Every structure is written in C-alpha cells, then in structure tokens.
Amino acid sequence: MSSHADSNPWTVPALAQAKRAGRKLVMLTAYDASFARTFDANGVDLILVGDSLGMVMQGHDSTLAVTTADMVYHTAAVARALDRALLVADLSFQADATPERALDAATQLLQAGAEMVKIEGAGHKLEVIRYLVEREIPVCSHLGLTPQSVLRFGGYKVQGRGEAGEQLRRDAQAVVDAGASLVVLECVPTPIATQISAELSVPTIGIGAGPGCDGQVLVMHDMLGLDSGHRRPKFVKDFLAEGGSVAGAVRAYAQAVRDGSFPDAEHAYAA
C-alpha cells in the first residue's frame, strides 16, 4: 500500500516518509518531454536526467563528454512534462570538482527545473555535498560504480566486494552525515547494499544492487530493451517485452519494483 497519494507531487521530505513506511521508490531516467510525460503518468516517482545521456543520446563511450549545458538543456525539457515525479539531475564530469563550481552548475539545473542534484563519490565530494546543502540545494549521492570514474576503475565493474564493502558502508554514512537526502548504489553486491539500506536514515536507490534497497532505477533505454550499442548489464530487464507498449512497460516495471519481484537473483550480484 502506498503511503503517498498517487496524485500528490513528490517532495524531498516525502522520500524519507516513504522509506519509513516501507514504500519502494520507482525511478527511471528520461531525457525529453515525451518520455518523461509517459513515465510521470504511469507510476514513476522520481525522474533522473542522467549524464548517461552522453552514451544513450549522444553516442559516446562514457559519460565524460557531457557538459553542464547538455544537462541544463535536457533537464529543462523533462521538467516541462512533469506533474508528479520528483526531478533529479546529474552534475556532469568535473562540474563538482570544487564547491563553487558545483554551486554554479547546481543553480543552473535547479533554475531549469531540477529539484535535486546527483553527485558521484564521497571523499572530497563530502565538502561539496555540505556546501550545496547549506545553500538549500538537495543532494542525491551516487556510490559504488560511479561512471565518471570509469578510467580509474578500468571499466564498468562491480564495486564493494570484500574489504571494499566496509569502505562503501563508511562512505554511505558519510554522505548522509554531509546532508545527502538520497543515495544511489550502483553495481554493489546484494548483501552489502541491503546492509547499507538498513543502516541509513535516507532512502537508497539501487541499480544492480539487489532487492534490499529502498527503490530501484534503470536507464530508460535498458528498461525498454533498446540496443544502446553497449553490452547489456546483468541487472537489466526488458519490460517492454512483457508490457506491450511503453506505458505498459513502465507500469510493469513500477509494479515489479513495488512488489519486490524486481530485481531478482538473476538481475543482481552476489557477495
């Protein structure tokens, strides 16, 4: 049972209320008004304008080429279509290198219609998170596999196994202590993601992090089974195949997240 009336717009405080009520959060990426409107009307709680647009919209091999101007353009397009879902937008590569740069980029994104900005990593990013939150800008943290760090990681690999899992737990608590209102966990083994989700006071959103998170997110192209030109990750499921239409696929995805049937073991990583 939902603790949030379907007709009510989502707010940042409502996310924490959903966690306390045990209500799973449904998130998808979107990059234009048409898809965003469809997602908003069919049960999606949060829309992410991700820098993944560099790969699925622009054809790059990574997210590194995406600029703040790109993010502002797509954020504004999506924002015009939303009535209910809460809009989150990524800070692009190195836009959060310093607190001042992050404030400039985040201000542009909020002026374009975003209600929260997403920042990858912990470490020196903790200062950035605190700086933004102190200036009334809601922040979503992104931990685990952080795509902007692909060169350092040597590819898109599972993060948080073994001793790295303990560091991930510490990082997750640190970003919340710095003021993050939401934490995305990407490509993290199910046991550690479940443990982190239980420990944090704010919701976690998983992508390849198992069913123990407080919600799930997928890139829309992956959820619809579209060929992005890249190898399909283990955690991806084609909901268009069973939904029969884009709207049907979104409803099937939302229902599967809420009833806990997605992700299952086939779409998650073991310890």
UniProtKB/Swiss-Prot annotation:
3-methyl-2-oxobutanoate binds at residues 51-52, 90, 118. Transmembrane segments: none annotated. Its main location: cytoplasm. Keywords: Cytoplasm, Magnesium, Metal-binding, Pantothenate biosynthesis, Transferase. Its cofactor is Mg(2+). GO terms for molecular function: 3-methyl-2-oxobutanoate hydroxymethyltransferase activity; magnesium ion binding. Homodecamer; pentamer of dimers. This is 3-methyl-2-oxobutanoate hydroxymethyltransferase. It comes from Xanthomonas oryzae pv. oryzae (strain MAFF 311018). The lineage of its organism: Bacteria, Pseudomonadati, Pseudomonadota, Gammaproteobacteria, Lysobacterales. The gene is panB.
